[in-house]
UniProtKB/Swiss-Prot annotation:
Entry GO MF terms: calcium ion binding; oxidoreductase activity
Keyword Manganese carried by entry: no
Tissue specificity as recorded in UniProt: Isoform 1 and isoform 2 are expressed in skeletal muscle, brain, lung and placenta. Isoform 2 is also expressed in heart, diaphragm and stomach.
The protein, known as: Selenoprotein N
EF-hand domain segment(s): 67-102
Organism: Homo sapiens (Human)
Gene giving rise to this polypeptide: SELENON
Disordered, as annotated region: 1-26
Length: 590
């Protein structure tokens, strides 16, 4: 077998084969590494773009501030709903609609004309404000267009009586309003007289006060229903101008506008609206008693909103069953308590801005008819117009028939029913402070007492008091136990301080002093013996804190939750009341 010559190829030898492809796992790692590198590069690019966009936005913001000033930027930002520092046609549409006379809600979700929106997107701007900011005279709402006057209808003249709030009754007056700027209170200080001392209304405007068909004497109905509750939240504080009134809201808005040009018929906090009941019925007439919760916003840009919330507006109207004649009308803020107005004002242009709160007293805020409604045009038997004045210049005097009432209800009972309609917790009778302890002695019961800064049963109440009355105090188990085992009362701190300083009655002094010793801001709930000794008490803020956590997180056995009730607040308040009974009942005189 010979050898091959040099350079001559032989058959292929079985030497090493060609390199095989890389294993799949190694390839996956390579791809993952490549993907990570690309992702990192993309993220870096995004960050660079974001920083660039932020820098551009900051530059635009700075330029806008320099060009428009603080107040102008505030207005611009409120319209710029997407925050891109440009006003698009859709964003400008509300202003355009107002300028062209349209009040329709836009299709972009801007709902500041809608009463169904509880959190408006533009919280301080609405249909009735856009043109007011651009012109010196506010535009009338499209909901308030007058019907053509009917010469045959009667008119009612109403006068406004107004005495401004007494600054010395405000809590912050005690330290000379230290830390409160004059600008913040300028709207309040400048409100010294009614906006319209007198106004004339057609009787048909009062049709919303007529009861629904078949309404019984003393049975409440809602003229304007409340749309808020603890579950819906509250309306924005950061608004200047009220939304256009609708339907039955219009007459309430017009009446309240006699006091101030910016009444809000729907309050920010529950209960809202207006409730009424019949207190007298005759063949041709009704007497209707009503209670209205409304408030006013006193500031205009560039100042921040200042809210003025009277305790309530109450009153009555006597009108014919077809609303063609009004015999009498009166509306007023009750002034029998030492404090009757809640005030809240913002220190910034956003919903999260700091807010100051105070309470005070307004001596008079009242509307009253000067007399019964009279015909707009007086005709004789032949249909000819008669001069409404005698030759001497004196106006003609009308003689009105006496109304014979067939059913009547007392003012006190009607007021109680309206109060319960607004505040279900008033299904328990809350007696005046000293009267409650007299009753407790007579019935040998403990006193359930609530001491607070603002009134528990009207709109001057403070935040934690509102929470209590809308949750635990109106719950069925609490109502039952309070009615069965306690005499209940609530009091203003200011009134007990006055009682404590009154030298004429030492027993009342002692009662007030025992309460004030246990009081902590803002609300204190107490269980007392008939002699005023406090056997148990809890602060509202602490109560709300412990009911906002899980039961197992509460260390105190005294305020532990019961498995009987699903609601932690109700369960805890029930434990508070029962502990008061456990401590107090053995100490009652047999």
């Amino acid at each position: 077998m010979g050898r091959a010559r040099p350079g001559q190829r032989g058959p292929p030898s079985p030497g090493p084969a060609a390199q095989p492809p890389a294993p799949p796992r190694r390839r996956a790692r390579s791809l993952a590494l490549l993907g990570a590198l690309l992702a990192a590069a993309a993220a870096a690019a995004v960050r660079v773009c974001a920083r660039h966009a932020e820098a551009q936005a900051a530059a635009r913001q700075e330029l806008a501030l320099k060009t428009l000033g603080t107040d102008g930027l505030f207005l611009f930002s409120s319209l710029d709903t997407d925050g891109d520092m440009y006003i698009s046609p859709e964003e400008f549409k509300p202003i355009a609609e107002k300028l062209t006379g349209s009040c329709s809600v836009t299709q972009t979700g801007v709902q500041w004309c809608s009463h169904s929106s509880l959190q408006p997107q533009l919280p301080w701007l609405n249909u009735s404000s856009c043109l007011s900011l651009l012109r010196s005279t506010p535009a009338a709402s499209c909901e308030e267009e007058e019907l053509p006057p009917d010469p045959s209808e009667e008119t009612l003249t109403i006068e406004a009586r107004f005495q401004p709030l007494l600054p010395e009754t405000m809590t912050k007056s005690k330290d000379g309003f230290l830390g409160v700027s004059r600008l913040a209170l300028s709207g309040l200080r400048n409100w010294t007289a009614a906006a319209s001392p007198s106004a004339v209304f057609a009787t048909r405007h009062f049709q919303p006060f007529l009861p629904p068909p078949g309404q019984e004497l003393g049975e409440p109905w809602w003229i304007i229903p409340s749309e808020l509750s603890m579950f819906t939240g509250y309306l924005s504080n950061n608004r200047f101008y009220p939304p256009p009134p609708k339907g039955k809201e219009v007459i309430i808005h017009r009446l309240l506008s006699m006091f101030h040009p910016r009444p809000f018929v729907k309050t920010r906090f529950a209960p809202q609206g207006a409730v009424a009941c019949l207190t007298a019925i005759s063949d041709f007439y009704y007497t209707v008693m009503f209670r209205i919760h409304a408030e006013f916003q006193l500031s205009e840009p560039p100042d921040f909103p200042f809210w003025f919330s009277p305790a309530q507006f109450t009153g009555h109207i006597i009108l014919s069953k077809d609303a063609t004649h009004v015999r009498d009308f009166r509306l007023f803020v009750p002034n029998h308590r030492s404090l009757n107005v809640d005030m809240e004002w913002l220190y910034g242009a956003s919903e999260s801005s700091n807010m100051e709160v105070d309470i005070g007293y307004i001596p008079q805020m009242e509307l009253e008819a000067t007399g019964p409604s009279v015909p707009s045009v007086i005709l004789d038997e032949d249909g000819s117009m008669i001069d409404s004045h005698l030759p001497s210049g004196e106006p003609l005097q009308f003689v009105f028939e006496e109304i014979k009432w067939q059913q009547e209800l007392s003012w006190e009972e009607a007021a109680r029913r309206l109060e319960v309609a607004m505040y279900p917790f008033k299904k328990v009778s809350y007696l005046p402070f000293t009267e409650a302890f007299d009753r407790a002695k007579a019935e040998n019961k403990l006193v359930h007492s609530i001491l607070l800064w603002g009134a528990l049963d009207d709109q001057s109440c403070u935040g934690s008091g509102r929470t209590l009355r809308e949750t635990v105090l109106e719950s069925s188990p609490i109502l039952t136990l309070l009615n069965e085992s306690f005499i209940s009362t609530w009091s203003l701190v200011k009134e007990l301080e006055e009682l404590q300083n009154n030298q004429e009655n030492s027993s009342h002094q002692k009662l007030a002093g025992l309460h004030l010793e246990k009081y902590s801001f803002p609300v204190e709930m107490m269980i007392c013996l008939p002699n005023g000794t406090v056997v148990h008490h809890i602060n509202a803020n602490y109560f709300l804190d412990i009911t906002s956590v899980k039961p197992e997180e509460i260390e105190s056995n005294l305020f532990s939750f019961s498995s009987t009730f699903e609601d932690p607040s109700t369960a805890t308040y029930m434990q508070f009341l029962k502990e008061g009974l456990r401590r107090g009942l053995p100490l009652l005189q047999p």
